[in-house]
A protein has these predicted regions:
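Non-transmembrane
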Residues: 1-327
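C-terminal single-pass membrane-anchor helix
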Residues: 320-357
């Protein structure tokens, strides 16, 4: 099946659907497995000359269906799987280690290829120990208070630039040097994948143990639930952040349209949890319990905020994290102002008496 054939008679749509169906119905498949299936069912050419192009096609379709990466075209040879990197993409080093992987891995399971690019599907840092309220490690949990960890403070205190992306792997990717935070702009996709067990689950690892942990199916589900919950933490549970959202949101170049679920997560004070597949809002979150997969990323920005201090009067007025400091400042300001006014009145009355005398 050549390029011209793909554009005729809905051939591409059939191939697109065939890939989604095959990877959903089979575990630990490779790109070569998918190519073999397409050659049998979609009458794709079975020659060595077309194998490289067919591998790249399958790699691209998997990226589009999972939204974990954007495939790059015509940037290197056909012996390399390449992902697209935007000109303004912040390379924090937490997600992508490289944007190219050899096609020699085409006969390996998807999760092996994905791990070659970096940490696109994160897994919990300590998967052998499940966090619970009775855990002895509870004292070391990092707390996340929506009043202290939110988009409003990120912008006003750290002057962070929020970058809306259509790459799920980049969600909560924070570059400290450029102070750029990437947020996934399509939360509805996470809901759809959780309900349909879609293509993203084909990247699940089947290895029981590994020195380099890779996400299994349950951890992929947890990852997407945490993506949804993170919008509540950063926006929905903090009044100034809810008001800030419509001013800072910008649709991505490819989508050009706002995800309908995004303003619901970011601008509603309360959400009926039965409608969405994630836990209820909490007054305080703990990274180990509520964000076991994304804990490293979310702790990074929370610690940045915790260590930051207002550097101007304007920032001081907006920073209410330290309630004692905030109200002490206002009380001192009020009493100081009253003292200045009384002193000024005393001078005025003294001047009046002097004139009258």
């Amino acid at each position: 099946m050549g390029e011209e054939t793909l554009l005729e008679n809905n051939a591409f749509e059939r191939v697109f659907t065939a890939v989604a169906t095959f990877v959903r119905d089979n575990e630990a498949v490779s790109i070569d497995d998918v190519v073999g299936h397409l050659r049998k069912t979609q009458k794709m050419e079975g020659t060595r000359e077309t194998l490289k192009a067919q591998r790249l096609l399958v790699f691209a379709i998997l990226g589009w269906q999972s939204m974990l990466y954007r495939p790059a075209f015509n940037t290197c040879s056909q012996d390399v799987f390449a992902v697209h990197e935007d000109w303004d993409q912040s390379n924090s080093g937490l997600v992508f280690d490289t944007n190219k992987v050899s096609t020699d891995l085409a006969d390996r399971p998807f999760f092996v290829i994905l791990k070659g690019f970096g940490n696109l599907l994160p897994s919990p840092r300590n998967i052998s120990q499940v966090a619970s309220e009775n855990s002895k490690t509870a004292a070391t949990w990092f707390s996340l208070n929506p009043a202290e960890t939110n988009a409003y403070l990120l912008l006003t205190l750290l002057h962070v630039r929020i970058r809306w992306v259509d790459c799920l792997a980049l969600h909560l990717d924070y570059n400290k040097s450029t102070r750029t935070l990437s947020l996934f702009s399509c939360p509805s996709f996470c809901v759809a994948m959780l309900r349909s067990k879609g293509t993203i689950f084909s990247f699940a690892s089947t290895e029981k143990s590994s020195f380099d942990p890779r996400a299994n199916e349950e951890e992929i589900s947890q990852f997407m639930r945490e993506v949804l919950l993170s919008f509540r933490l950063l926006f929905g549970q903090h009044g100034p952040s809810r008001k800030l959202f419509p001013r800072i949101y910008r649709p991505t170049e490819r989508l050009q349209k706002q995800d309908e679920l995004l303003p619901l997560l970011c601008m509603r004070k309360y959400i009926h949890q039965t409608l969405l597949p994630f836990s209820a809002d909490q007054p305080v979150y703990f990274a180990a319990q509520h964000f076991p997969v994304l804990s490293e990323r979310i702790e990074l920005i929370a610690k940045e905020l915790k260590d930051s201090r207002p550097t101007s009067m304007r920032e001081l007025l907006r920073d209410r994290r330290d309630t004692l400091q905030y109200w002490t400042f206002w009380l001192v300001s009020i009493y100081g102002s009253i003292g200045i006014i009384l002193s000024l009145l005393q001078v005025i009355f003294g001047a009046i008496q002097l004139v009258q005398g």
